[in-house]
Amino acid sequence: LHSDLSHLTKYTCNDMVVDKDGHAYVGNFGTTKHNIDVVPTCLIHVAPDGVASIAADKLEFPNGAVITPDGKKLIVGETYAGRLTSFDINSDKTLSNRKIWAQMMPTWIFYITKIRRFLKQVAKESGYAVRVPDGICLDEAMGIWVASPTTFEVFRIEEGGLVTDIVSTPQRAY
């Protein structure tokens, strides 16, 4: 699968998930290395023939993503919003019915991160450990394992936000 995505985003692309039919959903940073401001950005759909389009917009650094085994739901980690957001996958592979699947970051922290790019700086200054999603993995019980680089852990979270398991890591978890 090859596709030029530069007409859809000017930011560096990052994690991607591919469904059983070969359709890819690709996230991006929503910022550049030289830009302090973080802006909402998009999740890009790439069809097997390479045709790309915007699948969802106004996401805060769409990062790790999973597709449920039935192929009907996509869940993406929004790193800068500290949440997992779900979408229904329609038969034409478009996304609809956006919902917050689990909120990890308190709203007040989210507004601070709109001003400051690095969440670790917020945590350092506030003394508050801010969980954010990076890479994610869906388990057989429909829980999501989340790598959180800001808290040096991988944790399991259920829909609605209940954290059921935590594994501390000696280094940042991505």
What feature does the model see in each segment?
Residues G30-T41, T79-G82, P149-T150:
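Short, solvent-exposed loop/turn segments at conserved positions within beta-propeller repeat blades
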Residues S6-A24, P40-C42, A55-K73, M104-I144, ...:
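Beta-rich, blade/repeat-based domains predominating
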Residues H45, S86-D88, V154-R156:
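Conserved blade-register residue in beta-propeller folds
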Residues L1-D4, S53-D57, L95-M105, D165-S168:
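Beta-propeller fold detector
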Residues G27:
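Residue-level hotspots at or immediately adjacent to binding/recognition sites across diverse folds
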Residues P48-V51, A81, S91, T151, ...:
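Short coil turn/linker residues within repeat-based beta-strand modules
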Residues F87-L95:
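Short loop/turn segments immediately following beta-strands, especially the blade-tip
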Residues S148-Y174:
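C-terminal closing repeat unit and adjoining cap/tail of repeat-based domains
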